[in-house]
Amino acid sequence: ENVVKVSFRKLKYIHHISDIQIRNLKRHREYEEVFERTYNEIKKYKDNSVVYIGGDIAHSKTDMSPELVDQLSRLFKNLADIVPTIIITGNHDCNLNNLNRLDCLTPIVKNLNHPNLHYLKNTGIYKCADVQFVVWDVWDKDKDYIKAKDVGGDTKIVLYHGTVDQSRTDLGFKLPSKVKL
């Protein structure tokens, strides 16, 4: 069984962050200001909570500057210092055309070695307190995704970086996808 270790039994809050798409060199000061505000907001609701970063954390796939590595490292550490932090891969965090290449998040997470930082890289079921997180990995095909009916527990949340069929943009445009609800 895959377990996201937390110190509480019932999950109350999920602070959801996604598609940050931090650039190699641009707007880093602006990102830092926004991250500081984010840390302060999370601290207000940190009891029985986790941060979930839903992919596309970096922008440039596997092309990374030292500045980007530094900013990602600080972001992950600062969040994990506040609450358990769960991350998944987005299509901008890896090279989907070359599965032999390492994604850009793995070396950072591995080197931080933070007990509160959880990188859920693979499709699977991950128990976190009273919740079953079902991860659908960006490298997998939709036929390999685990269905909710096949997962035990009362609360099941799919962690997925991609389009779900019939999603709509803020302008009402429908986004097609093979992934159905």
Feature-to-residue mapping (PLM):
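N-terminal active-site segment of His-dependent metallophosphoesterases
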Residues: 1-75, 151-152
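His/Asp/Glu-rich metal-coordinating catalytic cores
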Residues: 63-181
